[in-house]
């Protein structure tokens, strides 16, 4: 039974009077039973939250960590031989953050295996509204960010976005500004920023109201589309021998493909012949970049590739967004035509030149070029963004049946069976994968379900979303560390050891790539269209939007975040001033003009209010205008019909955090006696007219969002102050992550609170009613002030060690379960590495795991095996906790073999120290070398840097320093 199902069994009555004596520890007295019907051949869908009732009668949702997360356990659960239909079994777990045992409060889920598959919705039940139909009102942080973003988008040089296209198609670049960042002429991801730029100007045009800004955006959209078509037409070449156009399938025959080079010198030759790219090809880099991945060429900007289809997707998405949001039909039609022709180029190449082979060894699977099973499983090189989503969208937008079918086929050519198949069975194959490489693929799978109606695609998307919520998400809604998903339920370990080098006590505090938040919000929105009565989707969107997304834009000047500030004493790493600066500069250029996108969902007879924010909705189909009058963040909202009238049902979300005082009144009359958090309240269909008012009161509740794993003593004590292993959590106020400051060590980042949070008080209003700081909410504890994460930008701490001052001591029981699970995982990695080492011909080129991390894991693995061999009677709890934590840390800090490790930075770091800080006397060559070296340092720290990048940076510095 999932969260939605069991909430229907409970009606939260008026909450009882709370015990106020701080000396009485509030304990969990009851957890609502968890019973799950699990289709045969799948692992059970377990809830990420359970409804708990405390000893004083208070109830709320709490996070739960299930014990079946080891991959072998899930594979066994999905084995129909072991668990046939009709069988039953239990899965244990713990309510995290509870002090009744070392692992939390024990819970069990009763699993019943049933015949058949998951119940999947046949079609979308609801839709969002166009950006132009929902406006954000008032003068607040939402409108401040939106207006800042529109001003900046209008200022971007359209010629800079066109430079690479003209260069790639042999057109004059005189008068065009060279692009920069990740779209610079010597970066193979070029085109990604131009794609985001097109999406950004299209969205900005949809929401802008200033006539001068609209005119600028109109001019730039028109020029972008016209010049892209001019470039694309260079590929419209008729071949007399073939008696048809020269197509994608004709480009780079296999013999040529096998010898194709990926150097910049080679690309300089390729761009001299755009007529060879194939009919319809449009990209900011020659078509050879897309072909090279068919030979399984690795991520290497200098010699091979950098995610060829990732940038193609961004450009397709930008053209589709122009066709969707712009109001000039001629330009919209042309944008759609450009996208369609490129989509058919992709179909042509995939259909005729690629295939899927899953059996055999990797060497056998790669013997012939074009095996998509291998192509899309490559780290970063095989990153395709949302290709399947854009191609599926195109198939919906074109009218020709043959083109529709081809585009949908092309969309499913970007399926990743190695990733998808386990997820379709609810087996967590998310672990250790590149985060933003895979989230957009899930969005694409769900989009293709809209047309192909194969439950496989819906199920893998739903399963992915559920797994991410419980196992990988941080309090702000973000995921990922060093751009990677780590092991399940290791968020705190990953955060507290990020980029940590031997001998250091401070981890690198920036994790949670903003692209991931952007895409998870998008996935949540799309899933909500199929099941809009499930409030969990909007609970997540609210969390991520109100914290990481809104907080990722510098309110003082246009800058966005790549990684986000999450760890100790973190300062938001603002930068990314253009869509081409980085991947997150691209998604950042889109984020801040569409906050209202998920505020409302509708169908012919129902309107769902998902977000409480000051907005005006023009529901054209019903002929009504609905205004939501509130501050932001909102604890009270009044929804009014201001124009028109109509019959419809209204559904209002009760947020998961709304545990006290939630109220809904229609024209002054209360609609229910109680309201269940994380559900929708249905106001049955009535005739709504001007003058009707729906009032929602939703006082923010104080609660702790716990990390799934404890902060181990060895990590907490790295600065020399001995600390015990403890739970770690984020202080929440309603949907807001509340950040403190002044904590540079884990000793300083400790909250002494009672189990009711009664010593945490609400601060007084700052009196600011307009602008970025309007309606600022604060909490206070022991003289410390906590402010919303979206507002606090520098020296912030979000996660604190939680010391419950009224907790009772607990019984200690030696349990090797977690350590044995880690040892099994370590053994799997060791076996994979040894298998690769034994290969006479190294396919793939790189080992599964990078050497330094692998060596660390081996050493700690041996220590852990010795501890287990002693037996439970001869091991102390401290020894067990310490060894488990060290092995967990060793496993979680391992990197794939093709990526550089922190140890690989030693020479580069030494050169950068000697180069010192550049000043006015520093040569331009050295300044550029220092800048590049620092960028490479950041990439390696973040987890995406390669050895060739370090080699290039060292070479640049040595040359500039004349060594």
Tell where the protein language model's regions lie, with residue ranges:
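Extended, well-ordered alpha-helical scaffold segments
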Residues: 138, 145, 212-231, 329-349, ...
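Aromatic (Trp/Tyr) and acidic
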Residues: 12, 120-208, 249-273, 289-326, ...
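Serine/threonine-rich, repeat-prone extracellular segments and beta-strand-based repeat modules
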Residues: 56-111, 871-884, 941-953, 957
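Solvent-exposed beta-strand/loop surfaces of large extracellular or lumenal domains
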Residues: 659-684, 704-710
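Hydrophobic, small-residue-rich alpha-helical packing segments that form membrane-like cores
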Residues: 337-451
